[in-house]
A protein has these predicted regions:
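GST superfamily/GST-like fold recognition
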Residues: 180-185
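Loop-to-helix element that buttresses phosphate recognition and phosphoryl-transfer chemistry
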Residues: 11-71, 142-158, 200
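Phosphate/ATP-binding catalytic cores across multiple sugar-kinase/actin-like superfamilies
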Residues: 155-170
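Short beta-strand scaffold positions
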Residues: 55-56, 176-178
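Phosphate-coordination/substrate-recognition cap region in phosphate-metabolizing enzymes
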Residues: 39-129, 188-212, 216-219, 235-237
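Active-site glycine-centered loops adjacent to acidic/histidine catalytic or metal-binding residues
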Residues: 9, 84, 179
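Glycine-rich phosphate/pyrophosphate-binding loop
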Residues: 121-148
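Extreme N-terminal starter segment of soluble prokaryotic enzymes
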Residues: 1-5
Length: 237
């Protein structure tokens, strides 16, 4: 049975600063780099040897995955990066301090933007500091100017169906090094988590989530490799 590892990037600089990051290409902190290395040790301990790593185009995910693979002695694993595994686009909240945003707009409104399934933040204004339309990584792509978790899932699912699922169905083990919300989307797909429950699923930084799948890609077992930093998992479908 194929195994899938979901690995959220290690702590980033803006995680530390409590800012809405989204698609901004911030780096890992020293703690984030240590989390990535520990993730690799856990992969080695679990005997996990992925045929491929899928990741986003953002360096905090790419560096986490690469460091984990290197620490596991798997540095030659093929890597495929795609923007559809990026973090959720936080629109007009991008770059803002979360506490200051709550003080300005009210905690209830910010909670809705952050934790509702289908309500996106205000769109990102064009031409500003965080306008991604001129970034060559997204040239010719229909990139959003804001996203909810639902619309994040809407871009993750076609990529999953076309690129990731076929590798698993072929019996290959796969690593996905990505972000809290793009990985939530994968968890929702696999575990059929209801809309009102998926927003409460927490995925800790740098802790590999191992999911064992049957031939139809239905989860048969799931566990965090670092039990001391584990979060609650959805019920197996």
């Amino acid at each position: 049975m194929p195994r899938l590892i979901l690995l959220r990037h290690g702590q980033s600089q803006w995680n530390l600063e409590n800012r809405f990051t989204g698609w901004v290409d911030v780096d890992l902190t020293d703690r984030g780099e240590a989390e990535a290395a520990k993730a690799g040790a856990l992969l080695a301990e679990a005997g996990f040897r992925p045929a491929v790593m899928f990741t986003s185009v953002l360096k905090r995910a790419q560096k986490t995955g690469a460091a984990a693979l290197a620490a596991a002695g798997l540095g030659d694993t093929p890597v495929i990066a795609d923007w559809r595994l990026n973090e959720r686009h936080y629109g007009g909240l991008t770059g803002l301090d979360k506490a200051e945003t709550a003080a300005k707009h009210g905690e209830d409104q910010v909670h809705i933007w952050r934790r509702s399934y289908d309500v996106p933040p205000p769109p990102l204004a064009p031409g500003g500091e965080y306008d991604f339309t001129t970034d060559p990584r997204y040239a010719g792509q229909p990139i959003p100017d804001t996203e909810s978790l639902k619309t994040t899932l809407d871009r993750v699912q076609p990529y999953w169906d076309a690129e990731i699922a076929p590798r698993l169905k072929a019996g290959e083990d796969v690593l996905i090094a990505a972000h809290g919300n793009s990985l939530r989307a994968v968890v929702k797909l696999l575990f059929a988590v209801p809309d009102d429950k998926i927003v409460g699923v927490e995925i800790p930084t740098g802790n590999p989530l191992e999911i064992t799948l049957d031939a139809g890609l239905k989860p048969t077992a799931a566990r965090y490799l670092d039990a001391d930093r584990a979060e609650a998992l959805p019920v197996l479908p």
